[in-house]
C-alpha cells in the first residue's frame, strides 16, 4: 500500500475510478459518444 500513501496518488485513483464509473453508466459524453 506504499503507492497509495501520497495524496496525489489517491486523487489519481479516485479520479480514474470516477471516470470509469461515469463511462460505464453513460454519465460521460466523451466515453460512450
From Swiss-Prot:
Belongs to the PsaG/PsaK family. It comes from the Eukaryota. It is a multi-pass membrane protein. It is found in: Plastid, Chloroplast thylakoid membrane. Keywords: Chloroplast, Membrane, Photosynthesis, Photosystem I, Plastid, Thylakoid, Transmembrane, Transmembrane helix. This is Photosystem I reaction center subunit psaK, chloroplastic. The chain crosses the membrane at residues 3-23. The gene is PSAK. It comes from Cucumis sativus. GO terms for biological process: photosynthesis.
Amino acid at each position: 500500500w506504499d503507492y497509495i500513501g501520497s495524496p496525489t496518488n489517491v486523487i489519481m485513483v479516485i479520479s480514474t475510478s470516477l471516470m470509469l464509473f461515469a463511462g460505464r453508466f453513460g454519465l460521460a459524453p466523451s466515453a460512450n459518444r
